[in-house]
């Protein structure tokens, strides 16, 4: 049996139908200025579906149909804290710090400061604070509802799979979770 890994990030790629539809319907998490939040994970730059928005959650759950139509009955939700490897803003800051570093004699402190900045790109608190969800028509910072993202991604999958295959019980487990997630799937630890 095949159990594919489903990551939260939707690859930013012109012509990719899931990406195009998500942008068109405004289903992705936002920045404070209303633009789509961009972060890099395995496929490169991505947008995260706003699974706290009921319409976006339903849409994301429906995307499992193309996989169930291919005979797949098990799913592993991963990277759904959501994990962030880096953002364009974080990389820009590191590049600027490196430019300042290149033209001077390095010290141990300088090297450790650069190292800390590079290793701090992943899952950076500032990135989570700059990502927003649509909760009942209000913009809510991700860092205030962080634990609900993995829960709602699993909820999207669980509800979608029940609608797609009401007479089947699909295998579904998730890396990230929250209280009550057991209604929709198991947790991978």
Walk through the language-model features, giving the residues of each.
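Catalytic-domain carbohydrate-binding cleft regions of carbohydrate-active enzymes
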Residues: 1-189
């Amino acid at each position: 049996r095949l159990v594919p890994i489903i990551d939260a990030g939707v690859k930013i790629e012109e012509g990719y139908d899931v990406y195009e539809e998500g942008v068109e319907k405004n289903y992705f998490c936002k920045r404070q200025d209303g633009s789509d939040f961009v972060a890099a994970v395995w496929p490169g730059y991505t947008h995260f579906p706003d699974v706290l928005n009921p319409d976006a959650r339903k849409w994301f759950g429906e995307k499992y149909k193309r996989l169930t139509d291919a005979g797949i009955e098990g799913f592993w939700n991963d990277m759904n804290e959501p994990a962030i490897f880096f953002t364009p803003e974080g990389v820009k800051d590191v590049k600027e710090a490196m430019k300042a570093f290149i033209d001077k004699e390095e010290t141990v402190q300088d090297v450790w400061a650069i190292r800390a900045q590079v290793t701090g790109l992943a899952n950076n608190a500032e990135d989570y604070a700059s990502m927003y969800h649509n909760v009942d028509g209000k913009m809510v910072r991700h860092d205030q509802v962080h634990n609900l993202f993995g829960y709602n991604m699993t909820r999207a999958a669980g509800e979608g799979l029940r609608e797609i295959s009401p007479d089947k019980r699909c295998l579904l487990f998730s890396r990230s979770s929250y209280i009550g997630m057991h209604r929709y799937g198991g947790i991978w630890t």
